[in-house]
Amino acid sequence: TKLDKGKSEYISFKKLIKTFINLFKTNNHDIDSLKNIVKNYQDKYLLKIILDIFYLYEEEKNSTSSLDFDDLIIIATKILNIKYNYKYFKYIIIDEFQDTSLIRFNLAKTIIDNTGAILTAVGDDAQSIYHFSGCDLFIFLNLHKYINNLKELKLVNTYRFSQELIDISANFINKNPFQLDKSMH
């Protein structure tokens, strides 16, 4: 029915706006960033609607003293930038590093920069699956630009699959020009 279609479209639009806000915040932007974009962008009608919804979303969170996941990461990073009494960080381990967002990496980098902690990051660019939630494979692929004295250890042996299956999947994965070159055994 027409009513069901309208409800379905509303739910889809709501999800789209929520995804936009999440991706925007995950990439270290805030309302002021969006205001600047709206001000400087010629076709600003949709962005203005999103900005208004963003304001309402933030107001609702503030009125209920709520935080979303991205807020927690951003606030933790700000606290670590202000307070220097966290010298007890010696090591940071990040698993599934290929699925790290900019704000999550900034949190780890703040600790590393202020404590000299050693980062161990484990990941596989061929297994990156969270781009839809703001994770950025660029961070994984360019970690050497952000971490001094980076040492890379490649694990090339797997015992999960036959060599035939490994070769078939590697042939498929290696067709992607953005993947790291790798050979598996």
PLM regions: where:
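Generic alpha-helical structural context detector
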Residues: 22, 74, 109, 167-174
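Proline-centered turn/helix-capping motifs that create local helix->coil transitions or kinks
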Residues: 25-33, 116, 172-184
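Charged, alpha-helix-enriched surfaces in structured cytosolic catalytic cores
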Residues: 12, 16, 48, 67, ...
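Conserved helicase NTPase motor core
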Residues: 42-142, 157-161
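Short, polar/flexible loop-turn hinges at active-site or ligand-entry regions and domain interfaces
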Residues: 1-8, 38-42, 61-65, 87, ...
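Conserved coupling/interface region of RecA-like P-loop/ASCE motor cores
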Residues: 127-185
